[in-house]
């Protein structure tokens, strides 16, 4: 099979090779007066790293330097390389090239404004993160001694503090797609719950009062796409349900 890219380069596709992959990438450049298009790049898994991010880096270094995407740690820690890979929001550094299909299709995170190619505009996402005041609030004031937690109190934070704000869950949530100007979304609400349950924080009531809103919190309809797609295997849906429970029973 022969495919011609936007730049008129001809790519011959050999589906018979188990080591040959073809990366189909969504492209858009605000400086070009063109509709979005797809570029297809051949990759040999014999001379490429094992992850999707390795393939993207090789494509940018060797085949098309104009390809634009975010990346940093390459270890699933920073959350920079979040994108939609074969229909699932994930981190490119954690998704293997070893798939059953020879074709891998990559989009930017869905329902986000696109800066270029695979780079979403997360300005609104981080502005919402700021709204929840993601830091310890101690009305009494801090002493010169450590602010200790018991082991039981510390365990309450497990499954919450590991969130890396990659936005995979929020970008998979239909409620967030439709209402991201008002609904905080699963990632931000999970982060909010992380501070609500922290025994060292003295502003739990204020945090719950802020979230007690039909749009900020209760726009969640428990679709649970968030928990299904989280690359860190966290459960934002459970965190949101816990916030609702605390508000209703407060």
Swiss-Prot record:
GO terms for cellular component: mitochondrial inner membrane. The keyword Iron applies. Binds 1 [2Fe-2S] cluster. Binds 1 [3Fe-4S] cluster. InterPro entries: 2Fe-2S_ferredoxin-like_sf (IPR036010), 2Fe-2S_ferredoxin-type (IPR001041), 2Fe2S_fd_BS (IPR006058), 4Fe4S_Fe-S-bd (IPR017896), 4Fe4S_Fe_S_CS (IPR017900), Beta-grasp_dom_sf (IPR012675), Helical_ferredxn (IPR009051), SDH/FRD_Iron-Sulfur (IPR050573). Keywords: 2Fe-2S, 3Fe-4S, 4Fe-4S, Electron transport, Iron, Iron-sulfur, Membrane, Metal-binding, Mitochondrion, Mitochondrion inner membrane, Oxidoreductase, Transport, Tricarboxylic acid cycle. SUPFAM superfamilies: 2Fe-2S ferredoxin-like (SSF54292), alpha-helical ferredoxin (SSF46548). Pathway: Carbohydrate metabolism; tricarboxylic acid cycle; fumarate from succinate (eukaryal route): step 1/1. The keyword Oxidoreductase applies. Its main location: mitochondrion. [2Fe-2S] cluster binds at residues 73, 78, 81, 93. Transmembrane segments: none annotated. A ubiquinone binds at residue 178. Residues 153-183 form the 4Fe-4S ferredoxin-type domain. One of its GO terms (biological process) is tricarboxylic acid cycle. PROSITE patterns: 2FE2S_FER_1 (PS00197), 2FE2S_FER_2 (PS51085), 4FE4S_FER_1 (PS00198), 4FE4S_FER_2 (PS51379). Its cofactor is [2Fe-2S] cluster; [3Fe-4S] cluster; [4Fe-4S] cluster. It is a peripheral membrane protein. [3Fe-4S] cluster binds at residues 173, 220, 226. Gene3D superfamilies: 3.10.20.30, Alpha-helical ferredoxin. Pfam families: Fer2_3 (PF13085), Fer4_17 (PF13534). Residues 30-110 form the 2Fe-2S ferredoxin-type domain. It comes from the Eukaryota. It catalyses: a quinone + succinate = fumarate + a quinol. Component of complex II composed of four subunits: a flavoprotein (FP), an iron-sulfur protein (IP), and a cytochrome b composed of a large and a small subunit. Belongs to the succinate dehydrogenase/fumarate reductase iron-sulfur protein family. This is Succinate dehydrogenase [ubiquinone] iron-sulfur subunit.
